[in-house]
Regions:
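Active-site cofactor/cluster-binding pocket
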Residues: 1-124
Length: 124
């Protein structure tokens, strides 16, 4: 069973709900990718997510754009998940520096900003 479901699409988070531990977390984007004609109303999907005790719902695309690039949406999601991962925030920051370091300091800074933006949604 899963400790967390991390999803860039809210309906997808519900698809994997049977695998989530009773005390697990769902961290999901609030904006759906509507790719089927009978996609349920967004409000209904989010209402189902909200039934899970431990949930975080955020508008990943808007936050990523505010940070400076829609390409960092996945790092925004990671930031929102950090309080529940059991890994120190500093270790995650170091991982980002390591992974993106070869792309230059500007890319590292952008991703660290995205990480913090995601985390700040949870720490409000």
């Amino acid at each position: 069973s899963a400790d967390m479901i991390l999803s860039l699409e809210p309906m997808e988070s519900l698809r994997y709900l049977p695998y989530l531990k009773a005390d697990g977390w769902i961290v999901t984007n609030s904006v759906p990718l509507i790719n089927i004609p009978d996609y349920p109303a967004v409000e209904e999907v989010l209402a189902e997510v909200k039934k899970i005790k431990n949930h975080v719902i955020l508008d990943v695309e808007s936050i990523a754009k505010e940070v400076g690039s829609p390409r960092v949406a996945n790092i925004v999601m990671l930031g929102a998940a950090t309080p529940f991962l059991g890994i120190s925030y500093e270790m995650i920051e170091e991982g980002i520096r390591s992974i993106f370091g070869r792309k230059g300091e500007e890319i590292v800074a952008l991703n660290l900003k995205a990480l913090e933006a995601g985390r700040s949604v949870v720490n409000k």
